[in-house]
Amino acid sequence: MTTTPIRFGRDIPDDAELRLCGDLNHAKRALELGVSRHRNALAMAQAGARAIAVDPDLAKLDDLRARAVELELPVQGHHGDLADLGFATSGSIDLVVADHSLVTVDDLGRLLRQVHRVMKSSRPFVISVPHPFAGVYTTDQYGSKVHPYGTVGRTVGDWFIHLARANFRVDQILELGVSETSPVPTTLVLRAVKEGD
């Protein structure tokens, strides 16, 4: 079976190129926070990890489970709020990936504290979100309208502050998606590592 790499968004490089997640094997546990369109929990399981996914949308979990059965991959699914990680013991997760699933989270601090609790120290937490600068300029039927930076989604600085307050250290920031059709980045990818215990 061909191993599918973990993906962080549409039309941007995947983890085979970016190498943000590290090696996964049978001894490692990996968590997908919010089932993404790429169903990264399947890629985690294909790589040999004990894959877990949590999502408040039961339909997404059912779709993930059906695909896992079809591919004969062991994937554990949990229905609930993204911050409800009580199923995982403290310090038990080696990798957490959130592919465009944290955009609408209201209490980001609570979620980050829970992710910090379940992760092993010095392990990666990879977050991808729409790049905050991509929402600055839009066009409507009356002409151009400019949205000030920070009025559409969290800014890069907001992400750094929230992650630092939850005791994560950002060690990589990637601004991806610049192309002939998009002069500004479309996707912001952050890799943070857990500090402390």
Regions found by a protein language model. Name each.
Residues 83, 87-96:
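A short acidic, Gly/Pro-enriched loop at the edge of an enzyme's catalytic core
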Residues 152-173:
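Short alpha-helix
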